[in-house]
């Protein structure tokens, strides 16, 4: 799917649908019996701003890490801790991606999605997405019913960074960085991730597929 006009054709196809982004979390063991929808919508647009924030609408087919680098180049803060996460923009709200002290929901404003059966565009705000720990409504009750078209992020004009995750501060210290900006935090995150996992484009791997355990507060 490279144009919105192509979406009207989907309802006529088989009910078995695989919505494919970058494919970084897909391993096929046999032929898929259904229609594969490859989301290749492109575009990054600054739609509005105020004194403290910018609102950036990003098409679902854009590569996540490329968007992070674009935000850093523009001095837009908020996603630098999510550097080098594989996949596309459209997949990011599905599981509320997160790493090193930041989750997608922290910078999420709204998204647009295509209702396959009703053949219309629907806008979801943060509450309607029902974000949880690596969870959203699109992984549960609305699974395979919508195709995410774009995500709008609310990013900060502030230079304040989040280095609460211990390893980030350790790497920054080893780099001799005393007052880090978003670029330095991104560099530290990239260094940490690269030391733990090979580039999936070079060596196929399952990445980090586990979730941290959640325990009652009284046991912490």
Describe each region flagged by the PLM.
Residues 26, 121-220:
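Phosphate/pyrophosphate- and phosphate-bearing ligand-binding catalytic cores of soluble enzymes
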Residues 1-111, 115-117:
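Anion-binding (especially nucleotide phosphate/pyrophosphate-binding) glycine-rich loop
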């Amino acid at each position: 799917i490279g144009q919105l006009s192509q979406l009207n054709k989907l309802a006529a196809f088989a009910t078995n649908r695989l919505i494919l982004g970058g494919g970084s979390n897909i391993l096929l063991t046999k032929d898929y019996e259904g229609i594969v929808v490859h989301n290749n919508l492109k575009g990054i647009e600054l739609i509005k701003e105020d004194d403290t924030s910018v609102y950036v609408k990003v098409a679902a087919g854009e590569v996540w890490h490329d968007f992070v680098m674009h935000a850093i180049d523009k001095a837009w803060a908020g996603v630098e801790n999510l550097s080098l996460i594989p996949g596309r923009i459209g997949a990011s709200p599905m599981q509320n991606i997160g790493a090193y002290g930041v989750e997608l929901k922290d910078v999420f404003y709204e998204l647009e999605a295509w209702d396959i059966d009703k053949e219309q565009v629907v806008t979801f705000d943060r509450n309607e997405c029902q974000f949880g720990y690596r969870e959203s409504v699109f992984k549960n009750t609305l699974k395979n019913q919508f195709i995410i078209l774009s995500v709008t992020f609310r990013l900060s004009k502030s230079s304040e960074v989040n280095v609460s995750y211990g390893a980030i501060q350790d790497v920054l210290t080893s780099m001799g960085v005393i007052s880090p900006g978003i670029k330095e935090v991104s560099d530290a995150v990239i260094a940490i991730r690269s030391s733990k996992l090979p580039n999936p484009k070079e060596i196929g791997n399952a990445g980090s597929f586990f979730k941290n355990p959640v325990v009652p507060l009284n046991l912490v």
